[in-house]
Amino acid sequence: MTYALSEDEFDSPQSQDINNKVFWDKLHDIFKVTLEMVKETAEEMGIDLDSIDHEEAAKQQEQVHKTAKEQPYCQAALSYIKKVDSWFGSNKGLLKDKADELQTLAEADIPGTRPADEAVSIQDCLEVVRWYQHQIYVKLCRAASGLIRGELEDLKYLPQDANGSAKVAIIGIERSIAAWGGLLNQFPQQEHPILDLLVNLKRLLRQVEAVFPDARAFVRLGFDTAVTNI
């Protein structure tokens, strides 16, 4: 069977307009041809598409996700989320007092003080912490899922996908460490709880690097041109 999938399918102005019925008719025709192509290819490979157990596949996927979430580094990332929420919940007054202090300094216009810059620095650190708080966990769960599925299904691309997700998590962890360091400079009275968070992040970083030793070297298309020094 010959398949004519080319620009000729969309050679008229009407067929290139996504709001035009002609466009969708052409796309539907290509969809049918593509399905037939897949069917023939599967037959040549001895694969019975009708024999695929979708319920079993869904169960396996659910088990993969469950196993991924149970990985020590995923559990550590989940624990970090809770610790961050606890810190913010316990320090609403501290943050408000600091804001009032900086506002007073700004109004006093005392030479040698830079309350506006200090406020921006604190806000930046807080935003970084919040931005990566959940992302680290999500990316590590995806990385774990890719690693597990790659081993189960012997698919080489999945470990690479896992490395990509792990790299994003590593970036998030290290930027979070830097942000907490900035907050520690601003709130020295919070030394104990912030150091506890930093220790947890550093331990998590070591776990991730041990499980995904190639993650740092992974090149993300559109983001990395070489090994990223974070």
Where are these regions (language model features)?
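Long, hydrophobic/aromatic-enriched structural stretches that serve as scaffold segments
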Residues: 23-50
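Intrinsically disordered, low-complexity linkers and terminal tails enriched in Pro/Gly
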Residues: 7-19, 47-62
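Generic alpha-helical secondary structure signal
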Residues: 21, 25, 36, 192-195, ...
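N-terminal cysteine/histidine-rich coordination modules
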Residues: 1-33
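Hydrophobic, aromatic-lined core segments that form the binding pocket/scaffold
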Residues: 51-230
